[in-house]
Amino acid sequence: MTLQLLCKKVLMSFPALGAFLFPVLLSGQYAFDGPISAITSGYGSFGNDSVIHEFFTVNPDSLYECDDTVRGIISYPYGANAALPVLLSFPGGSYVDFSDSNYFKSQEFYQSFVASNGYVAATAQYNSGPGSDEGCAYLWTTELMKNRSNLVDSTRMGMRGYSLGAGIANWLSLTMFNDRNWGSNGRFVWPDAGASFIGWHDDWPNDIYRQTDSGLAAMPDDVLYLMTMHDLDNTADPRTGIDIYNFMGVPDSNKEFYVIKGDTINNYIYWATHFTQSTYARDSTQFTTFITKHDALDYWFGTRMLHAVMETAWNNDPLARRICLGNGDSLQTTYANGQLRGPIVTDTPWMTMFESWNSGGGYMNPCEVTWNMRQYVTADACFTLNLPEVDDYDDFTIYPNPAAVDQKITIDADIEVERILVYNELGRLIMEPKIEAFTIDRPGLYVLDIQFETGTNHRGTFIVQ
């Protein structure tokens, strides 16, 4: 595959954005590793459009808590003559003032992918420190919608954030989708490997309502919401993602939680870590090797899911929906025709689905870090596996407990039961009984999640022996 990429270097020809041109022809720009081939056709493949990249700048603005000159990239199809759907991407929080060329290298893969398929992609780095992350994201996206309305269709929008950027994507989408109705003709949010919720720093008291359970519930129902976290990620505590996912107010049919799993094939390791989505940056914190190689996971986890959610949100494509929101459809869980281990896909995520949690090694950014503002507005933000036994609850009983293998287990509740979920001790959902009686064919410790019509739910352990 050869793409023609025309790069524009931005100066300040009007208040926020401007450009001068220099053409560059890049061929085979992505070194590829591993035994499984890249996707070259269908969902996840690069498109046929030639691509233009512009570097833009936005001046600091203390009103928006942005103390840095924002430097970013906007990419779009060559010859675009109408406003196109846009993907806004928010990077992790390295707080390194990268040169434009180095930041471009880290973002080129996904920027080019989106634009080659006929859409617009925009991203910008954070520069000096954490005081500017959310404010600068708010500022540059606002300026982009205002100054490039001839190119960017603010009614068709996706937000994708990685690590710290995942928290910004959660906050900014909730803010802009509600306050400005961005994405009203098709919208999605994809937080990856990330922080729970990053909003205003200085103005947090006036923004706190967005971070409450009811604030998260205000996400518009038509938003498509994908959350991805990674099996061996020792940076992001999965509880932060699970908490946000559980309270994010879109129907189950429009949201999905993924646990991305790695694999080893012919001695090549496909790492599923905090850095799975990177095709350039080096991981020097968790392993002694470069684990961010450009390989098949960048397509089956990365471009294929992104392609599918764009086509679902912006073109109402039913086949694409099965790939990104398939509720466990084989199109969603099968990678590379079964050659590569697929993800866990669930609406009821749990920490023990992650090897990083089961290993007991802890996290660089545990749920209890001071900047996880959710823990200040809800007591359940950093829940643990210290579950009570089912017998500790007064408003329902389960009997017999312990039960024998294949013995009928009955739930008797004072309140109408809406849903019953049963997990094994690894945190995997093993059944969803449709009536208040069921059997289990293996001994072990199990978790019962019982949800009532009143909106409350209880989790507790019981034994089959």
Spell out what each predicted region is.
Residues 100-122:
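Short amphipathic alpha-helix adjacent to the substrate-entry channel of hydrolases
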Residues 3-5, 13, 25, 391-399, ...:
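C-terminal outer-membrane/trafficking sorting elements
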Residues 242-385:
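C-terminal catalytic-base region of ester-bond hydrolases, centering on the histidine
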Residues 29-82:
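N-terminal cap/lid segment of alpha/beta-hydrolase-fold proteins
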Residues 83-93:
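Short beta-strand element of the alpha/beta-hydrolase
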Residues 82, 139-167, 175-180:
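Gly/Ser-rich "nucleophile elbow"/oxyanion-hole loop immediately N-terminal to the catalytic nucleophile
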Residues 102-104, 122-140:
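Catalytic nucleophile-loop/oxyanion-hole region of alpha/beta-hydrolase
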Residues 183-266:
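The feature captures the conserved acid-bearing segment of alpha/beta-hydrolase catalytic domains
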